[in-house]
Design a protein with these regions (language model features):
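Periplasmic c-type cytochrome electron-transfer domains
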Residues: 2-11, 19-21, 28-464
Length: 464
């Protein structure tokens, strides 16, 4: 699949579409299957057994895993699920990005402003000449036209621009990668190669929504004014989003702080039973939920728990417990999307980013005196089984738990914690540092941890 070069400034690289990726990956699996183990599948890690030759059934499973991975990655990175009908056609967000000089409205959004909003640029989509001009500072990052060029090159992570033949932007849709990928900053801060699964804690989703010219779609469903919608989303801040707003209409907590929650990572989730901060369901439940109800894609979603006028009045008004679309742009993609997400392991911290000796002592505390491993069971770091706890058990208020069907908080899987220290910890970032989390547990569970022990625990958490 080749994306054509339209812009004189930025060229779209050859995008490795499904068939290309598939072919490459199939070759690499065949390499393992036929080359390394002479006709055998790779043996299980600890197996002392002789591996028998691969059967047709074994081979077909291995080939399916390659296909699922490639398709799922394509969906995670590039599928909008038809969400352009909401972000473009209804909210007209593309017009605000373009600005009046380019067929839109207002001043437009420059690349520098987009980077300030936490949007990321995928350098694999840019030709070397553009990367050089970025590094030498000669590419104009203060012109909304360059933003449009980047969108045309499919280089803005998680955002897809649609253009007509006159190169005018006509709509815009969003992808999973918007919130759950970032980049490695290899070219410049905010510009580099993709890191799938990392929560984008720089992304100011609320500020992006707030610049949309027409928020009537949200205002109508929430039964408030557009100004109120703007005030609610402007209060979210970087790294946060409120997936429950369009279910219960609650924009703020009782203490008047935003009701939004942090964007969690979407890696290290294999083996974890329930997902999201409040354990709404499995990974695939949430994938269907978010693509239909939050991204405003067009698919099928069924969850009768939402048909609860007391807890979810907005969802009931909008009929969100039983969504059907024709054509269904989501359901056929859910299996591979699930598979891809489970394949994303939590990234290991680099050497030297934590103190190894202290981490080793912290590990003993985690399993022993501090009692953490009772809930954060290694190596999943959540409970195998029903990984949910009442607000009282962990010593916090019930506001966010009450916005979900189970009324509980899910034990966060802790691997890769080092990647998401920005924005704080716990669902709403209430603890600014890991040390603050440990202080909370020290008080709540009466642990009598010494200062040195707390430091060791922090080092252990940073090593996961
Ligand atoms: C606008 C930002 C945004 C987009 C787009 C988005 N998510 Fe999320 N995602 C979130 C937030 C916020 C949460 C936490 C929700 C909660 O607890 O209420 C979350 C939670 C999750 C979780 C649970 C993680 C865990 O720790 O259990 C998964 C899995 C996930 N999202 C996958 C996806 C997939 C797949 C897509 C695309 C179909 C997607 N998300 C699109 C913001 C987003
Ligand atoms: C009773 C079960 C339980 C015990 C014991 C427990 N935790 Fe937790 N932990 C949770 C739950 C539930 C959450 C999610 C809270 C939230 O998001 O509001 C959590 C969240 C966390 C987080 C934040 C993760 C994130 O992504 O923001 C850290 C860090 C953490 N726990 C570390 C520890 C440490 C260290 C200990 C031992 C001192 C410990 N926990 C003991 C249940 C537990």
């Amino acid at each position: 699949m080749i994306a054509f070069h339209i812009s004189p400034v930025l060229k779209v690289g050859v995008r490795a579409g499904p068939s290309y990726v598939l072919a490459l990956m199939a070759i690499s699996v065949m390499g393992i299957v036929t080359g390394l183990h002479s006709g055998c599948l790779p043996p299980p890690v600890d197996s002392g057994r002789d591996t028998p030759p691969a059967s047709d059934a074994d081979r077909s499973i291995a080939q399916n895993s390659v296909k699922m991975l490639a398709e799922g990655r394509e969906t995670f990175r590039f599928d909008t699920f038809g969400s352009e009908s909401f972000w473009g056609d209804a909210l007209k967000l593309h017009q605000a990005l373009a600005g009046s000089a380019n067929g839109g409205v207002g001043p437009g959004v420059t690349p520098n402003q987009a980077l300030q909003l936490g949007l990321k640029v995928d350098s694999d989509m840019l030709i070397p000449a553009v990367i050089e001009s970025l590094q030498s500072g000669t590419l104009n990052l203060d012109d909304p036209l360059t933003t449009l060029d980047l969108l045309r090159a499919d280089a803005v992570v998680g955002v897809k621009g649609f253009f007509d033949q006159n190169r005018t932007i006509t709509s815009i849709g969003i992808q999973c990668a918007l919130c759950h990928s970032t980049v490695d900053d290899a070219v410049l801060p905010g510009i580099g190669r993709r890191l799938d699964g990392w929560g984008n804690r720089d992304l100011n989703v609320g500020a992006i929504i707030a610049i949309a010219p027409d928020l009537s779609a949200l205002a109508n469903v929430l039964q408030v004014t557009q100004d109120t919608v703007r005030a609610v989303v402007n209060a979210w801040g970087p790294g946060k989003f409120d997936a429950e707003l369009t279910l219960d209409g609650k924009g703020f907590r009782p203490d008047n702080r935003t009701a939004a929650t942090l964007i969690p990572p979407a890696f290290g989730l294999a083996g974890v039973n329930l997902h999201t901060w409040t354990g709404w369901g499995s990974v695939t439940h949430w994938n269907a939920f978010v693509s239909n109800l939050e991204m405003h894609g067009h698919g099928t979603f069924f969850d009768p728990r939402l048909n609860d006028p007391v807890r979810f009045p907005v969802a009931v008004r909008a009929g969100l417990h039983d969504v059907r679309s024709n054509p269904d742009l989501i359901t056929p993609k859910l299996a591979a999307l699930h598979f891809y997400q489970l394949a994303i392991a939590a990234p290991a911290p680099a050497d030297g980013t934590f103190v190894r000796e202290a981490a080793r002592r912290g590990e003993s505390l985690f399993a022993g005196k501090a009692g953490c491993a009772r809930c954060h069971v290694p190596p999943l770091f959540t409970e195998p089984g029903w990984n949910m706890h009442t607000p009282d058990e962990i010593g916090i208020d019930s506001f966010q738990a009450d916005r979900s069907p189970d009324g509980r908080y899910r034990t966060s899987p802790l691997k890769g914690l080092w990647t998401h220290q920005k924005g704080g910890f716990y669902h709403d970032g209430r603890f600014p540092t890991l040390r603050a989390v440990i202080d909370h547990y020290d008080g709540h569970f009466d642990l009598s941890l010494s200062e040195a022990e707390k430091d060791d625990l922090v080092q252990y958490l940073l090593s996961l």
